[in-house]
From Swiss-Prot:
EC category name: transferase
Functional pathway: Protein modification; protein glycosylation
Species, as recorded: Homo sapiens (Human)
Protein family: Belongs to the glycosyltransferase 22 family.
UniProt GO MF annotations: alpha-1,6-mannosyltransferase activity; dolichyl-P-Man:Man(7)GlcNAc(2)-PP-dolichol alpha-1,6-mannosyltransferase; mannosyltransferase activity
Protein's UniProt name: Dol-P-Man:Man(7)GlcNAc(2)-PP-Dol alpha-1,6-mannosyltransferase
Gene Ontology CC: endoplasmic reticulum; endoplasmic reticulum membrane; lumenal side of endoplasmic reticulum membrane; membrane
């Protein structure tokens, strides 16, 4: 009976993960500049296909090239739904949601596959808690629909972790090679540690590992070079260039640096929330030692690079969640033994509530971080579709939500050129979407009127005298200008 009950709950757990990811997607439907390449590339594959001249990356290539293999996969799975939307003449904005939703389902598929292995190794309660712990944390669910290179690699990494737990070494090596060579070369630290442990424990021999690693490396490298050289119009291995730029030249430091232990005292507590408190208890089970040490070891090695972002270590969160879930299940399984376990069980439930409250707060604040996307939506609401529109989008707007999916009027012209000088050089545009800088706005006082102002967040402060107990500070970030009629 217990087995049947556990089996009956599994669809509910899967539905929980899908529902939480959907809420994050709907509340924050727009994207940031870090997601731009993969999102724009997917758009171009869906709407331009072989017409490379229309592709965004040829005009705005970015600092280093990125692989097209991820966007190709997303476009393939998104295309049926996007085709139906086009037949219904629905806005391309909904296609953006479809594309991001497909990526989210890919991540959830990886999490669900990993959950099955957790269930097989640790039991139903640990697997159930793994799903609840993961769903209530903010960053993993928030990022799972975002077209970041790290997130595109995440489904492959999760499948590799499941193969590692199953001791399916051939599958693990092939998936690892694909993730490292195609998507994120720094994954050699994380997945390499997993392989080294297997080699050290003699679960797989060096000869057998090489028998799979060599052909996997050659085929994956050949695949990415062939596909990406076609789209970039030059012989290229994107992740090789990223490795050279970020690691050898250390140019990633241009985007800021953080202290050596930042991942441990800042990123990890924010990523795991209160679930972090249950990791020591989960270590009572010796089977959790290897996943935990390897995840922390990856973070320690990656800490040597000065430029740090939470999303860079997102692969470690599921491994640590397994240990946290084991700690939670230890208390819940012993609920009837003493009042101490009863109190501990209440703490387990309470920590999920606290994590959910933090996630809701962070999601609410994040909603205001995409003024560019909001401004594009306002433009199409305020200006009649039959109007002749030539819109200029400045850098601040392009980095905070503007994408080709939001260019929904095929008769309008949208321009992101960065070489147009402010002032008289902008008079050719009927509309301007720009940063709300007083000095720049003064240049258009006599030639344009403000059609809309869009706010964004500047910070959050605690206020215990109200509910919710915080204030979100907003200020005007972008303005949408419309050119005044010229005197006849």
């Amino acid at each position: 009976m217990a087995g049947k009950g556990s089996s009956g709950r599994r669809p509910l757990l899967l539905g929980l993960l899908v529902a939480v990811a959907t809420v994050h997607l709907v509340i924050c439907p727009y994207t940031k500049v870090e997601e731009s390449f993969n999102l724009q590339a997917t758009h171009d594959l869906l709407y331009h296909w072989q017409d490379l001249e229309q592709y965004d990356h040829l005009e705005f290539p970015g600092v280093v090239p990125r692989t097209f293999l991820g966007p190709v996969v997303i476009a393939v799975f998104s295309s049926p739904a996007v085709y139906v939307l086009s037949l219904l003449e629905m806005s391309k904005f909904y296609s953006q949601l479809i594309v991001r939703g497909v990526l989210g389902l890919g991540v959830i598929f990886g999490l669900w596959t990993l959950q099955k292995e957790v269930r097989r190794h640790f039991g139903a309660m640990v697997a159930t808690m793994f799903c609840w712990v993961t769903a209530m944390q903010f960053h993993l669910m928030f990022y799972c629909t975002r077209t970041l290179p790290n997130v595109l690699a995440l489904p492959v990494v999760l499948l590799a972790l499941a193969a590692w737990l199953r001791h399916e070494w051939a599958r693990f090596i092939w998936l690892s090679a694909f993730a490292i060579i195609v998507f994120r070369v720094e994954l050699c630290l994380f997945l390499g540690l997993l392989l080294l442990l297997a080699l050290g424990n003699r679960k797989v021999s060096v000869v057998r590992a090489l028998r799979h690693a060599v052909p996997a490396g050659i085929l994956c490298l050949g695949l990415t070079v062939a596909v990406d050289s076609y789209f970039w119009r030059q012989l290229t291995w994107p992740e090789g260039k990223v490795l050279w730029y970020n690691t050898v030249l250390n140019k990633s430091s241009n985007w800021g640096t953080s202290p050596l232990l930042w991942y441990f005292y800042s990123a990890l507590p924010r990523g795991l929330g209160c679930s972090l408190l249950f990791i020591p208890l989960g270590l009572v089970d010796r089977r959790t030692h290897a996943p935990t040490v390897l995840a922390l070891g990856f973070m320690a090695l990656y800490s040597l690079l000065p430029h740090k972002e939470l999303r860079f270590i997102i692969y470690a969160f599921p491994m640590l969640n397994i240990t946290a879930a084991r700690g939670c299940s230890y208390l819940l399984n012993n609920y009837k033994k003493s009042w101490l376990y009863k109190a501990g069980s209440l703490l387990v439930i309470g920590h999920l509530v606290v994590n959910a409250a933090y996630s809701a707060t962070a999601l609410y604040v994040s909603h205001f971080n995409y003024p560019g996307g909001v401004a594009m939506q306002r433009l199409h609401q305020l200006v009649p579709p039959q109007t002749d529109v030539l819109l200029h989008i400045d850098v601040a707007a392009a980095q905070t939500g503007v994408s080709r999916f939001l260019q929904v009027n095929s008769a309008w012209r949208y321009d992101k050129r960065e070489d147009v000088q402010p002032g008289t050089g902008m008079l050719a545009y009927t509309h301007i979407l720009m940063e709300a800088a007083p000095g720049l706005l003064a240049l258009y006082r006599d030639t344009h009127r403000v059609l809309a102002s869009v706010v964004g967040t500047t910070g959050v402060s605690l206020n215990l005298t109200q509910l919710p107990p915080f204030n979100v500070h907003l200020q005007t970030k972008l303005v949408l200008l419309e050119r005044l009629p010229r005197p006849s």
